[in-house]
Amino acid sequence: AEGAWIAWYAAKENLDGYLRWALNSWTIEPLLDSRFYTWGAGDTYLLYPGGRTCLRFENLVAGIQAYEKIRILKTELQTQNKTATLRKLERVLESFDELQLLKTPANVVVEKANLFINGL
């Protein structure tokens, strides 16, 4: 869920981008062995040969979609002067804090936040 979490964090910090260092830095046999020296298995790529996807990529896509939804919601809530709902959204975004990850897993934070924005 870290791929989705980072997009929510970007929304919280009002960032307009995210740099992912590797998209397809494949090993010799990426479909058989995704280990890459000192990095975790699969960490060096989000797409596999032949256009295959992976959970890391799917989570990143979900996060990007949430980021865009948050951006649109913020604009609409400001335009409609729905300050109470906007404050609730800001409080949800505040839960995306690196130190919070020590206590609450990323997937739990993302799931709660998705429930909130999908209910608006």
Language-model segments: residues:
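Catalytic-core region of carbohydrate-active enzymes that cleave or remodel glycosidic bonds
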Residues: 1-39
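Catalytic domains of carbohydrate-active enzymes that cleave complex glycans
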Residues: 15-16, 31-120
